[in-house]
Amino acid sequence: MNPNNKSVLARVFLPLFFCVFAGVSSAQDIPWADSAEEVGMSTERLERINAAMQRHIEAGTIQGAVTAVARRGKLVHFETHGLMSVPNNRAMQDDSLFIMMSSTKPVLGVAAMMLVEEGLIRPTDPISKWFPEFAEMQVAVLAPVDEDISPIRVNPLNVPPHRLVPAAREITIHDILTHTSGLASGGLGTVLSAASIGGLDNRESLAKNVPEYGNVILDFQPGSRWQYSAATALDVIARIIEIESGIPFDEFVKERIFEPLGMNDTFWNVPEEYRGRLIEVVGADTAPPARAVLYDTSHSTYFSGSYGLKSTAGDYLRFEQMLVNGGELFGNRLLSPRTVRMMSSNQTKDLFSNNVEGQGFGYTVATSENPIVAKQRRTQGAFGWGGALGTRSWSDPEEELTAVIMIQQPVPQVQRDFENAVQQAIID
């Protein structure tokens, strides 16, 4: 197939508020099973992953992919598919670097849980403990309707009649980690606060920007709704981690997460010698200013907890394997099993399922509460997240399974087909 003759139907929707070493590490560092059957999977059925990816490549929906699966601590599948550069007809590599977008968020979640374990923060802590600007926030509501709720989607050129009311309570770390804070989640308050949230500028810093977010008008009363904050709220937690640890967020994550897990190919800023391994993204029609920031690979000083990482399938599989192991990998314990369970348990009651039936939401990850209702091919209790360009991963404690798919066109059907192919390959 000549991919140049195929259209890649990728579209990336960016909300108004979306602001913004050496050595090759791969999944082979997780030991290979002697056979898939050794860990209760079918070699023949795992081939269906390859068939599914090839089908989508030939259809022109994706340019390529890297897929990886491990069970019971052993690797059973690690394959490259298609092209990392369509114009240059360059084959995908097992160490290709992908733009992770919101797959950055679970890394922030683990970092936050580390501080919870150390007693430096608590989920119930108000954000005003660190930033007084967050003490007396306001909520945008419709007027004259007497209810404290605002529409989630607002045309910034035609803002409806509205009024501001005091927040019923302060927002907390729990609210931000679960996307129930109302901070910069794309509603009326976000539109009214565009100037406070700021533009896309990755030359700023968490220290400068985060206090200004206290001036943002909330989209709803804290704790009353689940609505995704794609690029702002979790940065507040990243800045708190900086304050409590005494080091920049990127250094904390590198020292406390990446280095213990051997994630040597995961960066906000990709070293020059590795930039040839970056996927050349095809089909994303992001506006030029946003694209310049989100795809920047070497010059950022704003180390977001929401987006910005670049990584490989092998590195991210290690991260997921650590979680499915209950917080430990290669003899290095990052979290206790109980803390991982807290992070991966539904913390939002039915607020998330009102948006996505059959699922719950923990601390930065979605949880499978009823896979049938959720139209998932996962086990109840599995958890994970993904990024806007198509990266997706999950950990399944019951099946002792981790799976990662790296693509750079956000095509949900590709993710579903991968998930189905993984699940049907389990034979005990």
Regions from the language model: what does each represent?
Residues 410-428:
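Generic C-terminus detector
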Residues 12-23:
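Bacterial N-terminal signal peptides
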Residues 392-394, 399-409:
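Short, well-ordered beta-strand elements
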